[in-house]
Each structure stands twice: as C-alpha cells, then as structure tokens.
C-alpha cells in the first residue's frame, strides 16, 4: 500500500470551504458565508492536513492579537480518526497560538480531551432552536449597522470580546443575505445583532445588548426578517439566565451544547449582556 506523507499547511480560502463542508457533515450547520468571513479574522489562522494529495484534517486557530486566540474547526475525516493525524494538527495549531490565552467551544464528546491540553471549563453555551416570523417591534431606535461608522460597531463589539476584531466584524455585518441591526440610546449604540443564512435556517449571533429589553426588541426585529417556515438558532451562555429565559419565552428548544473553555484565565466579559454568541468556531 502507498505510504503517503502527512503534511500540514496554512489554508487558502478554497481549502477553508472544504473545512466548512466537513463542519456541515458533522451537523454543525455553518452559515453560507462563514468561511469568507472567518478568513478575514486571520488568514494565517486556518490549518489543513493532507495525506498525500488528500485533505483529511483541519483546525482553525485565529490569533486576534498577541494575547488571545480562538480554536475551532477541529475535524478529522471519519475514516482517518484514531491514527494520530488529529493530534498532529492540534499541536501545530496550539504552537501557532503559543503565548495566547486560547478559547474554544468544545462539543461534549471532546471536553475531557481538551482538559488534557490544559483547557479549563468556564461555562456552557446552549444552542436553542425556534422559528422565524412574527411582528417586527415598533422601535424608532433601530438602526442598520452597515450604515453606521464601522468604528462605532467595532467599539461596541470589543466590549464583549477579549480582543478587537476589526476585519472580521466588518465582513460579518456586510455578508450576503444577512440582517445586521442595532439599537441606539440617544447617540450611543446600546445593542447589536446579526441574523445570517445557514445551510439549515438562520442563526442569530451576536446578540449583545445593554439591557434585557433591548435584547428582546432586537431579537424580535431579527426574527421578523425570516419566514415563519424557517428555523432560527440562538447560542446562549447558560450563565445568563435572562438570555435563557428569552429563548424559552419564544418557545425555542434546546438542540445542542458546547463548553466554553480557556487555557488561561477566563476573560472578564459582561456575560449578562451576551444574549447570543457570535460563532462557536471563532468566538
């Protein structure tokens, strides 16, 4: 039998689309434009492993700055699992993020393995599933994010994330067929949210808000952009009981969970104002 060498390289965008297809096959239901948006966050932060000429493994290790990175897309094609290829690309990814506090959202089946690499549990994120439609709220303070100065949106996003993600946020709020809305309190941005098309339905994320009232208004505004026949998904930090209650109020059901884990200290973020996580893949 041919002895094929295993090689790891930085992905190009075409290869990131391959990893997105693997994520779809794993049941992770990525957004239709996720690969293009994620790539903007750190073009060097996506690794792919080839066995000969065949791509068989992936990992994303987005380095937002010199102190914080996010790990995701850790996938080995099923027929090649248990042969050490995953560990090789895992180690290459962590080497790229050396010196960073590294975060991930780990599926239940892998959480014990992540602990062996010094990841520590911070809290659970819960994916809720519901349906679109409903009346748009009567709110004169709603704004379209792409019409605001991008610096204003990035400044608000940065309060909820351990690092600035300028290129990513710009791509995220301008991706095709999404709706990116905010709420202004006077001249100040007080909430932001995005709903984007996925292979199945739509995902809301992020949903950040200064108050529960703003979060609910923005949730309803985003939900109303989608047909009542479409599924919608919202990924909620379980520690935010008000966010959980919002999902339950609108008859959303629990469909999936992850563990948010960090190698370093848990960042001091306003989780009580995080009503929806941006993405399980890159934070």
Task: Show which residues each predicted segment covers.
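Phosphate- and divalent-cation-binding pockets in alpha/beta enzyme and binding domains
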Residues: 58, 112-114, 242
């Amino acid at each position: 039998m041919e002895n094929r060498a295993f090689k790891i390289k930085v992905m190009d965008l075409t290869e990131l689309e391959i990893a997105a297809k693997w994520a779809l096959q794993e049941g992770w239901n990525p957004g239709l434009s996720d690969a293009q948006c994620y790539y903007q966050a750190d073009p060097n932060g996506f690794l792919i492993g080839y066995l000969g000429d065949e791509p068989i493994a992936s990992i994303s290790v987005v380095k937002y700055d010199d102190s914080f990175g996010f790990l995701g897309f850790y996938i080995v094609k099923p027929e090649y699992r248990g042969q050490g290829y995953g560990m090789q690309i895992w180690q290459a990814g962590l080497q790229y993020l050396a010196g960073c506090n590294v975060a991930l959202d780990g599926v239940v089946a892998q959480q014990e393995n992540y602990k062996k690499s010094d990841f520590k549990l911070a809290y659970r994120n819960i994916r809720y599933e519901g349906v679109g439609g409903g009346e748009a709220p009567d709110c004169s303070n709603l704004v379209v994010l792409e019409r605001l100065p991008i610096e204003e949106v990035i400044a608000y996003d940065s309060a909820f994330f351990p690092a600035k993600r300028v290129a990513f946020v710009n791509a995220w709020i301008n991706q095709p067929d999404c709706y990116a809305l905010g709420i202004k309190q006077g001249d100040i941005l007080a909430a932001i949210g995005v709903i984007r098309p996925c292979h199945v339905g739509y995902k809301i994320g992020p949903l950040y808000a200064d108050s529960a009232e703003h979060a609910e208004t923005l949730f309803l505004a985003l939900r109303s952009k989608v047909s009542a026949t479409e599924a919608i998904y919202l990924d909620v930090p379980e520690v935010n009981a008000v966010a959980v209650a919002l999902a339950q109020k609108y008859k959303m059901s629990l469909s999936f969970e992850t563990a948010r884990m960090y190698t370093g200290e848990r960042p001091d973020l306003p989780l009580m104002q995080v009503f929806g996580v941006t993405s399980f893949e890159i934070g």
